A protein has these predicted regions:
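Catalytic adenosine-cofactor/nucleotide-binding cores of aminoacyl-tRNA synthetases and other
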Residues: 1-132, 199-228
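Short coil/turn segments at secondary-structure boundaries
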Residues: 21-26, 34-37, 139-144, 170-177, ...
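Aromatic-anchored, charged helix-turn/loop surface patch used as a conserved interaction hotspot
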Residues: 115-167
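C-terminal accessory/binding modules appended to enzymatic or scaffolding proteins
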Residues: 147-199
Length: 228
């Protein structure tokens, strides 16, 4: 993988499949990729896996064939027979920033609370360990470009004000829902934008409890950067 990015070091933070995905992208002429790309490569692999097993429907036949072929390639033409338990790497990163002591068991408990997993497994434990290594080693703000219309921006601004208050919020999930409805924004669409801002993905755990877990002020600052 070159002088700076060695496969041995990479495997502290990401799976062998993510290395193969990296190599494929390099072969196809992508920009130079490094450790900072591990979160997006890990989550891209999850998406390829969902496409391969039919959990994500792709109408474009060419894209479907390409995605399925790429998934087989990164699994060395021997893909698993059924979809393994999955957790968003970026979700794990956010949790690893909070939980430093007894990390694996505490994050497993949160993942079960969020209904992200049904039970613990060695594979999930390994993912938590890798995400923990990444969170401890790098401080990378993984922001993506999001097209946000004025109505949604207005609702986001109100949410920022709410999150910046020092008082305890009893039912943040409902408060977020009411802010969206009050600004004539479809709650489902509002939640999707929040996941994009916080996790760079379109879905995630129940948003209210998750925001409280990773810190209201922290999330408020993140959202604030998108509504300026």
């Amino acid at each position: 993988l070159g002088n700076v990015v060695t496969s041995q070091t990479w495997l502290k933070f990401g799976t062998p499949e993510s290395i193969l995905l990296l190599l494929y992208k390099r072969i196809t002429g992508a920009r130079e990729l490094g450790f900072e790309d591990i979160p997006s490569l890990m989550d891209e692999y999850n998406e390829l896996e969902k496409i391969f097993f039919g959990k994500i429907k792709i109408d474009n036949e060419a894209k479907l064939v390409k995605s399925r072929g790429l998934y087989e390639y990164v699994n060395l033409l021997n893909p698993p027979k059924q979809i393994p338990a999955q957790v968003s790497y970026r979700l794990l990163l956010e949790l690893c920033k909070i939980f430093k002591e007894d990390r694996v068991s505490r994050i497993n408990k949160k993942l079960i609370d969020y209904h992200a997993i049904k039970e613990t497994s060695p594979e999930i434990n390994k993912l938590i360990e890798m995400a923990g290594n990444f969170a401890d080693e790098f401080d990378i703000s993984d922001e993506i470009e999001i097209d946000i219309d004025s109505k949604v921006k207005g609702a986001l601004s109100k949410l920022v004000i709410l999150l910046e208050k020092d008082e305890e919020i009893e039912d943040l999930q409902n408060e977020i829902y009411q802010i969206a409805k009050g600004d004539d924004v479809e709650p489902k669409e509002f939640f999707k934008v929040l996941y994009q801002i916080i996790l760079s993905t379109t879905r995630g755990p129940k948003i209210g409890p998750f925001i409280l877990d990773i810190g209201k002020k922290n999330v408020g600052e993140k959202i604030g950067r998108y509504v300026k």
